[in-house]
């Protein structure tokens, strides 16, 4: 087969201007980016699949060669498979996410269980300890994501949870400020890449159309963590032994995480093609339904520098990073809640129950958000923007209300706490709105760095000199975290709508021209091979794959 002309080839390296027509991405001098040539083809073109390098192919390519004669699922079979994935993959991820946030919240509950007295720290040092967690979180992003791409996902997740189990247990040995700082730093380090890993996993098993609906379930597990954690904290205060309540709390949480680690080691999937809880036929259908819906690959273990560059040049990457930075400036409210409750004359014992009520409110909000997203689809920006309204209202009430209105202040604090819904929506949207495994991981790193930097700053806004009203912290939250953030989401939507209009116009002219890619590479024997491949079989970025339509 003749090689496509240079005029038909797209140079990835130079395609940094996302506002141009995709047809303009042509470099007649360079011809193509090494190993990948994108060409528009006709129906009569060859559809053969030569033996090309794994650097180009998606990880599940070989597995999917067995699905060439796969018969389409009936609606009933598709529903049965989808619900099986919900009760295996989604439940597993929700449990992991819940324990991840319970571990983060251990310090918050320990603050009312005797931590301050046993370790001789004050409120400002408590804020510094929270900051150190996110310093470790930032430092762990790049090495964590590199390990994630290099090693099997299941082993990476199990190793991370095993390390954080050990660190949680070691908290019981801490007796001063320095010890707590070191432990929280390393806890942030080992937990740093787990949230992006879970997002990558959900992207392997569910198409974009379903991912947006499933994201609020992560919010349920995130804020729902305060329900079991609150009851555990409530119970340990009745324990009659020589162990401090906060240490007993750490031991119980560490024990639960230990058993979770064992389960993850055996059952967490590396990718769709190796999931133990699915039959071989179910794995084939799962990969097939994700590919056909997303028009993109699922996983690649080869690091691609050009995808990193493309991610950094994409303005959407930076807008998502800026959004999560603004949003998470208010995240320390979750760590301050128990202290705020006690400052309103709620006892240590009862503050744990108020925390449970707050978690219940947030879970109900997440269920409502999920229902709204299932009814009004492909409107992530508007759904996210709407859920900032309760936070703004609650924040203004906290600032404006007299401190004597204790019940009103409690209610306002709880109402203000559901800013996590837009965070979860944007977390899923940031990875769903790009393609290319290295690009997804790069965008995930940027997103988590923005998340971590905001959480480094956040604790420092709650200075003891501003107690008990903490006006500076509330003003930053109202003005930046909850008022600027929704506009960032709307700007992202505006950009993606413009891109989709151009792509849909091209696909309307001739869809099949943009669904295949011409590949030239060297196989394992050193031979030069080339041929046309379906885009869904390859690890292409959204900029290379013109059949990729951005979810809104």
Curated annotation (Swiss-Prot):
Example GO biological process: cysteine transport
Primary localization class, coarse: membrane
Gene Ontology MF annotations: cysteine transmembrane transporter activity
Subcellular location, record wording: Membrane
Transmembrane segments: 83-103, 163-183, 185-205, 216-236, 248-268, 353-373, 381-401, 410-430, 444-464, 472-492
Region (Disordered): 1-23
Membrane topology: Multi-pass membrane protein
Gene Ontology, cellular component aspect: endoplasmic reticulum; membrane; plasma membrane
InterPro entries, per database record: MFS, MFS_trans_sf
Keywords linked to the UniProt accession: Membrane, Transmembrane, Transmembrane helix, Transport
Family, per entry: Belongs to the major facilitator superfamily. Allantoate permease family.
Name used for this protein in its record: Uncharacterized transporter PB10D8.01
Origin organism lineage: Eukaryota, Fungi, Dikarya, Ascomycota, Taphrinomycotina
